[in-house]
UniProtKB/Swiss-Prot annotation:
Pfam families: DsrE (PF02635)
Family: Belongs to the DsrF/TusC family.
Record's keyword terms, sorted: Cytoplasm
A GO cellular component entry from the record: cytoplasm
Its biological purpose: Could be part of a sulfur-relay system.
Protein name (Swiss-Prot/TrEMBL): Protein TusC homolog
Localization per record: Cytoplasm
Length: 118
């Protein structure tokens, strides 16, 4: 059972929740080993490689996702249907993830003691 699950479901850079979620996740990883991270819906765009943020005057926090390995964040799931609906594949993403169907995602969310949504 995962003690904490971080659920990313919003597109990056439209507001600060994505950045705040990554900051909270990295901070929690210092105290908690049982972490899971889930990207669904527009949240899959958080992991999209090649984001150009200079034109919208936003700081690009996408490189922070590459810190997951350093922080031993191993359970990273992406919704297969969300990728397909947006014409994306796992090769379009910044980091290695486990692409799973909605049934598996429901299991991950159900087995979580605490769910934090961003």
């Amino acid at each position: 059972m995962s003690q904490l699950t971080y659920l990313f479901r919003t597109a990056p850079h439209s507001h600060s929740s994505g950045r705040e979620g990554v900051d909270a996740l990295l901070a929690a990883s210092a105290y908690c080993e049982a972490l899971s991270v889930v990207f669904i819906g527009d949240g899959v765009y958080q992991l999209l490689a090649g984001q150009q943020t200079a034109s919208i005057l936003c700081k690009d926090y996408a490189p922070m996702f590459k810190l997951f390995d350093l922080y031993d964040i191993e359970h990273v799931y992406v919704c297969q249907q969300s990728l397909q609906q947006r014409g994306l594949t796992s090769e379009d993403l910044l980091i290695d993830v486990e692409v799973v169907d909605t049934v598996r995602l429901q299991g991950v969310l159900h087995n979580s003691a605490q769910l934090l949504s961003f």
